């Protein structure tokens, strides 16, 4: 048959149409009761959380590649509002906050993205990711049916979605984003506040759906997630979780691979056998997406850590704080992922047939026309079991699952760890520091930069969280006839504070310190102080250690000295100083002088050599050092210091607080049995955090290190180490 030009043109157009339709089909994300469907295909999705601001852009490619090599399909991240909009309408998407770059790197690696926009994140992040300025918007009430909050939240959410669309990053545009999350763990808050919470849930769902991303929206810990939005599970175990509709897939957005470290707390860890067991149990009971929170935890640089959170956000993740594989956790989970993928055709084609193999043992068998997979489970915490399945014996350790991708061959058991353990060491680099020091004087009531008020003021309303530090200053005049001057029985100063730490200076000398903790952020300082006849200078340095990241009514949270403040033991009994006239000052002097940078004020004289201050409060230290050879990750050993902050070449590597020793019960930990954050602990009696990550990408050939020490420490004990 001979085709004329018109026939050929019609065929060519038909082919183009088919190709176009094919592209449309391929660029699609939907779901059914079994799984997320990408490009028309159901998928078992293995995911890991990597938060872009908690590492450096130079680290991102390596982290993403290791995640891919570890068997992951998806990278999950929050979006950090306070990092992106530090002032109203002023946006920042550079350096560690270059969200677009991060997502494009994930795409280049061939992985997908679950973008948890929130924009509330919790995440042990300062103020839960909210910008502090939001607290002071008139009429503001957080995360409820409140117009000022909804307007701000909608504006930022739209900003992020439009940015993703402009860069063509949603899967329907050919990008990697296959899921997006609105809000975050809101169910408990909704339950607590009632009707306004329910109204807010409906509003936020409709707002998100109206943005037309082309990919499914999810809400975690949200049993009443409306309509097409998928409700998902967070926790150590989610095997028994069920979504609120039989038409939605069973998804796990946070499988906690460990837990956070707070100052004053021991360091938690979670045995990999238990993580693998939890994943296998979830998959055998119909789960189709598992996300490890965290896969790489990273570092809380700057002042981004939440209330009392350590600068390290290592989380006992498969990739440690420095980006190195944690073994055997990384490799044992990699083997799990391979076994699950071998079973994927059967898992997604059929529902499980469950058969008892013993009192606490059972088989989950998935049949399809072309495949069969079985999960053999032993729920017994104490005893191993030999079971018969299809006429063959299988040995199941306690609290374990064996995976048989062909219903015959055991390729993996969650408790049989074949990967070798690797112990990481912190090895001194031999770097020598030659310290200079500068001691701050305590401010006085009438000096420059102070302002006065009658009574006590709340700290964050004054600082707007631009500094951790806020001074409360007053004078106490003691008459010569006061009895305590003769008896030597000094009066008792009592200061009640909403947190987090308080340094009390009397006549320029540190009289004492008090601090709270994560479970009890409020504090009371109560100590006898030495006063003389005449005017005595009282300076209270109130210190915030991050802002709370979880709870309700963010707009009502307070910090600082709110009183009462009393002096007991004077002739007239007790003085209530709470309503006295107080002077206030935001920040410490060194911050105002930018001592952490190379552009410091020339008016500062640094003490050198043998005159360098040791064990003195309010002391700044600086030195220079050369970058060590090699490519091993670097850290500072700060074990001889007390509390403060550290800068490298003007960049803040986080708060240090080695003086706060870890409380808790450390000892042997059995993987078997239900895990919680207190079960497996290390570091008891030692500093909650000793080593502080120094990113190599922040270094030059010669570098400046600056330390601000609040309590007093010995800088000669600081050393630069490499992680090997």
Curated annotation (Swiss-Prot):
The entry's keywords: Apoplast, Glycoprotein, Glycosidase, Hydrolase, Secreted, Signal
PANTHER family: BETA-GALACTOSIDASE RELATED
Record Gene3D superfamilies: Galactose-binding domain-like, Glycosidases
Tissue: Ubiquitous, with higher expression levels in roots and siliques.
InterPro entries: BetaGal_gal-bd (IPR048913), Galactose-bd-like_sf (IPR008979), GHD (IPR041392), Gly_Hdrlase_35_cat (IPR031330), Glyco_hydro_35_CS (IPR019801), Glycoside_Hdrlase_35 (IPR001944), Glycoside_hydrolase_SF (IPR017853)
Induction record: By sugar starvation and exposure to darkness for 24 hours.
Summary of the function given for this chain in its UniProt record: Preferentially hydrolyzes para-nitrophenyl-beta-D-galactoside. Can hydrolyze para-nitrophenyl-beta-D-fucoside with 5 time less efficiency.
Principal localisation: secreted
Organism: Arabidopsis thaliana
UniProt protein name: Beta-galactosidase 4
